[in-house]
Curated annotation (Swiss-Prot):
Main localization (coarse): cytoplasm
Organism, as annotated: Edwardsiella ictaluri (strain 93-146)
Family in the record: Belongs to the XseB family.
Function text: Bidirectionally degrades single-stranded DNA into large acid-insoluble oligonucleotides, which are then degraded further into small acid-soluble oligonucleotides.
Gene giving rise to this polypeptide: xseB
Enzyme Commission number: 3.1.11.6
Assembly notes: Heterooligomer composed of large and small subunits.
Gene3D superfamilies: Exonuclease VII, small subunit
UniProt xrefs under SUPFAM superfamilies: XseB-like (SSF116842)
Name of the protein this chain belongs to: Exodeoxyribonuclease 7 small subunit
Gene Ontology molecular function terms on file: exodeoxyribonuclease VII activity
Enzyme kind, highest EC tier: hydrolase
Length: 80
């Protein structure tokens, strides 16, 4: 059986990890390669968080729309 790719961390978990990365980077104690690796991870987490927030915002807009008969459908961030 093929292994599945690891699931993206939950928003709150990703945010917590991102905050820890920022603290480590701001300390200035990391070697260059490790700092770059942490920075890359932080960028991925920030982008994932932004996408999650955009999807949540779209869901809220749909739920609060005036059209009670409007169908709810999955939001695809790539459509915008």
């Amino acid at each position: 059986m093929a292994k599945k790719a690891p699931a993206a961390p939950a928003f709150e978990q990703a945010l917590s990890e991102l905050e820890q990365i920022v603290v480590r980077l701001e300390s200035g104690d990391l070697p260059l390669e490790e700092a770059l690796s942490e920075f890359e991870r932080g960028i991925r987490l920030a982008r994932q968080g932004q996408q999650t927030l955009q999807q949540a915002e779209q869901r809220v807009k749909i739920l609060l729309s005036d059209d009670q008969d409007a169908p709810l459908s999955p939001f695809n961030a790539e459509q915008e």
